[in-house]
Amino acid sequence: MKVLSNPRFLAVYSAVLTVVFTVVVLCAAAGLRNQTFGIITARRINIVEPDGTVRLTISNRADFPGAWNRKKEYPRPDRREAAGMLFMSEEGTEQGGFIWGASQLPDGTIENHSHLSFDQYEENQVFAIDAGQEGKDKFSRISMVDQGDFPIEEKRKGNEGIDKLPVNEQDAAWERFFATHRHDVKRLALGRSPDGSVGLELRDQSGKVRIVLAVRSNGEPILQFLDEDGKVMNRPK
């Protein structure tokens, strides 16, 4: 028993255990590095870089993430309406996403939606594809947008401050904000409207519609060229 209580023996015993434990852990880690699975069931999966930076999130509706900016996640309760995916840059900032959902309400009304978008660097979406249905109304569209050249973090901070203002002061506050921060401008819209018409709208850099190509729900074709005041310059018969 004296041998077991000898300090030298205890030191050697401790060292041996440490080595054995380290070998076991390393071998286990090596074995886990490359694994093959048939089916994985999860509520949310984060794909990360070796340094922990999240690059892709696949999530259900309940656990859908907020907005990511510079490796920090900000709450977005409004995003808990669909399952989907979020794409993040090497810097941990949101770069786009894909969400979807469909359900039938107790009264039989159908709600169906899907959205795929890609973002400008440190900004909001510049290209998006949407499709959906609300009751009997169906739509689908492709959109292209010019975004401002300021970091979206500035808009987030501005939004936090403006939300604290009285409701009757918020519109004026946003006008002051966008006086120094260029607002997003829709440049192209291609889609099908709920009334069954299809069309293409092309806009100038200020967001004014300049060309319209469409087929109305009654089958009538439309081709319009508009000036900067919205006046039709010519309309082929």
PLM feature spans:
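Parallel beta-helix/beta-solenoid repeats that form elongated, surface-exposed shafts/blades used
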Residues: 25, 30-237
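Single-pass membrane-anchoring alpha-helices
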Residues: 1-34
